[in-house]
Curated annotation (Swiss-Prot):
GO molecular function ontology, one term from the record: FMN binding
Catalytic residues (UniProt): H301 (proton acceptor)
Identification of the protein by name: FMN-dependent alpha-hydroxy acid dehydrogenase PB1A11.03
Residues binding FMN, per UniProt: S136, Q158, T188, K277, D332, S333, G334, V335, R336, G355, R356
Top class in the EC scheme: oxidoreductase
Cofactor annotation: FMN
EC number of the protein: 1.13.12.-
Residues reported in the UniProt entry to bind a 2-oxocarboxylate: Y54, Y160, R197, R304
One Pfam family linked to the record: FMN_dh
Annotated family: Belongs to the FMN-dependent alpha-hydroxy acid dehydrogenase family.
GO annotations of cellular component type: cytoplasm; nucleus
Keyword terms, alphabetized: Cytoplasm, Flavoprotein, FMN, Monooxygenase, Nucleus, Oxidoreductase
Amino acid sequence: MFRNYNWFDAKEPISYESEIYAKGLKFQRPQITVDGRHWEQLAVERMTKDAAGYVYGCAGKRETYDKNMESFKKWSIIPNRLIKSGFPDLSTTVFGQKYPFPIALAPVGVQKIFNPEGESGSCAAATREHIPYIISTASATSFEDIEKASGPGERWYQLYWPSNDHQDITISLLNRAKKTGCRVLIVTLDTFILGWRPSDMDNGYDPFLNPDSIGVEHGFSDPVFRKQFKEKHGVEVEENMLEAAKEFAGIVFPGISHDWEDLKFLRKHWDGPIVLKGIMNVPDAKKAVEYGMQGIVVSNHGGRQQDGGVASLTMLPKIVDAVGDKLDVLFDSGVRSGADIAKALALGAKMVLIGRPYVYGLALEGSSGVSHVIRCLLGDLELTLHLSGIVSVKPKDLNRDVLYKEE
C-alpha cells in the first residue's frame, strides 16, 4: 500500500520537545518558534504582499474566519488523574487504512509564491513525518514532480471539479492522480468560483491568471489540455501563457456548481475512496451517504470562500451524530494547536487537516519549516492528551465526555 515505506517507523511526537531542549544545552535555538500563535505574523512579514494577502486573506470582513478561531474556545478539555499509561496512541483509521497520526496536510495551491520549494518541499515533509499529503488542483507543481519529491509517502488528490463540458479534462486529471499514486479523491464543493477576497482584490492579484504556471501547472502539464489549447489557438501553451492560464482557471473554476447526480461520473472514473470537502450541514452529509461517498470533510475552506458563515467546529458534532457511523468524517478550519486537534477529534472527527500553519512553515524555512510545524502540532497533541489522562485518539477514549462546553 505504501510503496515499501515503513509507515509506522515514526518518531514519538513528544521526542521533539526533548530534541529542542538537548540542542538548547549547546546554545542552539529553534529556527522557528514552537508557539503556533506567532507563525502567521512571522511568515507574513517574510512573504511578498501578494503572497501574504493570498494566504492570510479571507472572504468579506473575515467573520467566518473569526468564528472558526473563536469556536475552539467554547470547548474545554477536562483532565483525568491517576491514569497510569504510556504515551497516547495517536493512530487512526480512515477509508480502511490505519495511519500513525490523526492529521494530514490539507490541499493548498500556488505554494511556490510562498517559497521556491513549493509543493515539493511540503510533500517531502509530509513523507518524513509520516502523514498524508493532499495534492491541490491549484498546485504550482505537477503530479509527476510531486510524486518524485514525495517518494514513498501517502498522497491524496483534491479536485477542483471542471464542468460537465470538460469531462475529458476531469478524466485526465483523475488518471494522472491515480498513475502517480494518489489513493483518495477529495472533491472540493465550495470553490466552483472564487469568493469575495478583499486582500487579493486590493492587491489586484489572482495567482491563477498570471502568465506563468503558478496555480495552473496541472493544466499546463496535462496532455489533454495542451492538445485542446493547441488545436484552438495554433500554438503551444508556453507561447501564450496568459491565455492558457485564463482558460485552465476557467475550466477548474467554472462559475456554477455540479449537482448530486454528477457524483456518479466521478465514481465511474475513480475506483478508490471519494470524500466530499465542504459539507457544512446535516442534510448534505446524509446526501453524501446516500450517494455512496466514503467520507466528508466538515470545512468552510478556512473562511476563504463565504463570509458570514458558521464555524466548521460548530457543525461538526451535529454532522457526526447524523452520519458518523456511516462514513468517515474529517475536519478542517481554524486548527492552530494540539489542543485544537484534540477537540476536533473529541467532537467526532477521525482526522484533522492542517492548512495555513504548514504554509507558514514553508514560507519561513521551506521543507524543514513544514516538518517543524507538523512536529510541533503532533508533540503538542500528544502532551495535551497525556497530561489529560487520555490514552488514545480512539472514540472510546477521546470523545465529548472529556469536553466541557463553556457558556
